[in-house]
Amino acid sequence: MNPLIQSLTESQLRTDIPNFRPGDTVRVHAKVVEGNRERVQIFEGVVISRKGQGISEMYTVRKISSGVGVERTFPTHTPRVEKIEVTRHGKVRRAKLYYLRALQGKAARIKEVRQ
């Protein structure tokens, strides 16, 4: 990679990102602009995928809201995300948990890793 591009991307990387994997339950504090004011909206769900690397890394969080599955994809190093909290670590054997989209209720649960 070009050294100039590499130095620019390294300066934009965030260092306050916790270590999380697919299967973990996270709370994402995202800044939302409504009209002329800005507020923080918390989106809590299971990480179903992480893709990319460096400045272009993204992760997808899935939750069930009023019986409807909602997925949101966030860039990992964006300033629009105030912070990420890892609520619990899940035990899964896949990197992409897209199969959770077809499951409902207790079948969609993920075992927790005990430490």
Swiss-Prot record:
Coiled coil: none annotated. Keywords: Ribonucleoprotein, Ribosomal protein. One of its GO terms (cellular component) is cytosolic large ribosomal subunit. It comes from the Bacteria. It holds the Pfam family Ribosomal_L19. Belongs to the bacterial ribosomal protein bL19 family. This is Large ribosomal subunit protein bL19.
